């Protein structure tokens, strides 16, 4: 299972029908869902009495393997936020409907990081990669499947 698939599973694999007071006004609270996930932040409640994360909030999976802190829209990561995986990798940037979308930085625990544009959680367009211990960044173009990088040359 990929990181994005496990995130979707964690976020959608829950039931919140225990809320009965419906209102479209945003509220702030903390919840522990039946699957053990925790959410702290803003939300609304649908007419069907379902919690919809909406606004600023933090979602932590029960096993602590996924943590998202940022903006939510209609129960999806949407806007600016930070997603941290249990293996130490992270993504800081823009989200749209649970996907990396727009400008963002994906970082690995060894210090490497990839900064560029994303679409559908795939890198596209101009990007820069800085590897751990390399000291010299690479720049290049990504098309969602392959990334072509070269050393970044600085003028003196």
Description of each model-found segment:
Residues 1-156:
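Intrinsically disordered, low-complexity repeat tracts enriched in Gly/Pro/Ser/Thr and acidic residues
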